[in-house]
Amino acid sequence: MATEVTRHIKPTIERELWARSAGRCQFDGCNKILFRSSVTNESVHTAQKAHIFSFSENGPRGWGPFKTGLNKLNDICNLMLACHECHLKIDRAPERYPADMLIDWKSKHEDRVEIVTGIASDKKSHVVMYGANIGQESSPLVFHDCVSAMFPDYYPANEKPVLLSMHSSLRDSSEGYWQAENAHLEEEFKNTIARHAKSDDCKHFSVFAFAPQPLLIKLGALLTDKLDVETFQLHREPKGWRWQAFDDDFKFIVKEPQNKTAPPALLFSLSDNVDHERVRIVLGENLSLWEVTVESPHNDFLQSKIQLVLFRQAIRKLMVDIKKHHGNATPLHIFPVMPVSCCIELGRARMPKADMDWIVYDHNPSNQKFTQSLVLSGGSNG
């Protein structure tokens, strides 16, 4: 005959369970708040104290290692806080939800709570999401994915992101696209980021963007290097926004033109090798072509935050060199073929009162050529 032990859980154990779980369901992927109604937001107690190993020998997952210490079945190590639905799941299908899986879920949930509650108050950051139409592709911007990439260095200042997005039927190859998107971005920036920077206690911004490269450069120019900004990069492998390890041998390569007396052009061959003839088709043969590249250009080379720091350093020095040879009255023609985060940081490096005009080009898929998209004036970042 099976023996049962008491279901009674000491108040001290129950309080510790609530604290460790932060009042949320510990079933992996649920995370439901258990002290407030999701419908009315009224205070309501919906939590259940679920045993990993059962208080009954014939119950789900049995007694396990507690068979020789039944008095410890109600200890904190054998309890999960769960909602009613998840409690039913784990007890009705113990084969599907074995003890080692539940212990792992409990441990990871409690570790996450400890880390989050240990983050200093100055680690708050506004999550900025900027997306625009790119050919036929849909935006990969998902708030939860962005928050995961920030963690544990920063956590969101608000439950919702700062959205800089245009719901336009225009495509980047259509007439009027650049003018419409540029004007919309300026207006949205003024109404959101500029307002937060002026009046909000939190003045840090985590930027996640996936848009045509000229618009990303414009966004960076609006942000400037005066705002406290962390720019993120969408990676293909491994997929996501989280920064990866750094290759110590990495460096950016700057190629200077032999002739520095002609009108200047700046080519970024980072995501792919770019034939210089593509630039000459647009500007002609009389030009001084500066180029920034890497040893093996490809579309997923930028994996580390340190690489982005090195890019900023290289750009600041390069802009000084270009102005030294060409002055700041001659416009600089910019041809970007590079990651989104590099585009934003290029714009942030711009000094509106000191730099020449930037004429930014984009690859037009309809004619397979670079075409002029935006002009950033020397006296402003617009």
Name these PLM-found stretches.
Residues 187-197, 307-328, 342:
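A short, acidic, amphipathic alpha-helical segment used as a generic capping/interface helix at domain edges
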Residues 18-26, 75-79:
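Short metal-coordination and nucleic-acid-contact micro-motifs, chiefly zinc-binding Cys/His arrays
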Residues 87, 206-217, 269-274, 333-344:
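Gly/Ser/Thr-rich loops at beta-strand to alpha-helix junctions
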Residues 25-30, 83:
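Short cysteine-rich clusters marking metal-coordination/redox-active sites
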